[in-house]
Amino acid sequence: MDLNAKQMTSEEFSKLIENQGVMGKSNITFVIGGSLGLSQAVIKRENYKVCFSKMTFPHQLFRIMLLEQVYRAFRIMKNEPYHK
C-alpha cells in the first residue's frame, strides 16, 4: 500500500486480484506502509502499488479494511451481491 499509488474502486481492486490469478499467481502479498512509507528494499520488490486513501489509519484498523476489500473482491468476482 503506497500513498503515491493509484486509488481504485472495489470493482477495479477485484479485477486486479482476478488478473493475478489469470496470470498464474496463486499468492498475493500485501505490504502496509508505515507513516514514513516503505523502505527502498521493499519498493524494489513490489509488482504493483495500491493506495486505499490519502488518510492515515492505525495498522490494526487498516488490516481489517484490507481484509474486507479482499472479501468484497471475491464476492464481485463471483457476481455475488455485496453491501455498497
From Swiss-Prot:
MF (Gene Ontology): methyltransferase activity
Reaction(s) the record says it catalyses: pseudouridine(1915) in 23S rRNA + S-adenosyl-L-methionine = N(3)-methylpseudouridine(1915) in 23S rRNA + S-adenosyl-L-homocysteine + H(+)
Cellular-component GO terms for this entry: cytoplasm
The keyword Transcription is annotated on this UniProt entry: no
Binding-site positions, S-adenosyl-L-methionine: G33, F52, S53, K54, M55, T56, F57
One Pfam family here: SPOUT_MTase
BP terms from Gene Ontology: methylation; rRNA processing
EC assignment: 2.1.1.177
Cell compartment(s), UniProt: Cytoplasm
Top EC group: transferase
Swiss-Prot/TrEMBL keywords: Cytoplasm, Methyltransferase, rRNA processing, S-adenosyl-L-methionine, Transferase
Subunit-level organization: Homodimer.
Protein function: Specifically methylates the pseudouridine at position 1915 (m3Psi1915) in 23S rRNA.
Family label: Belongs to the RNA methyltransferase RlmH family.
Protein name stated in the entry: Putative ribosomal RNA large subunit methyltransferase H 2
Native species: Clostridium perfringens (strain SM101 / Type A)
Gene behind this protein: rlmH2
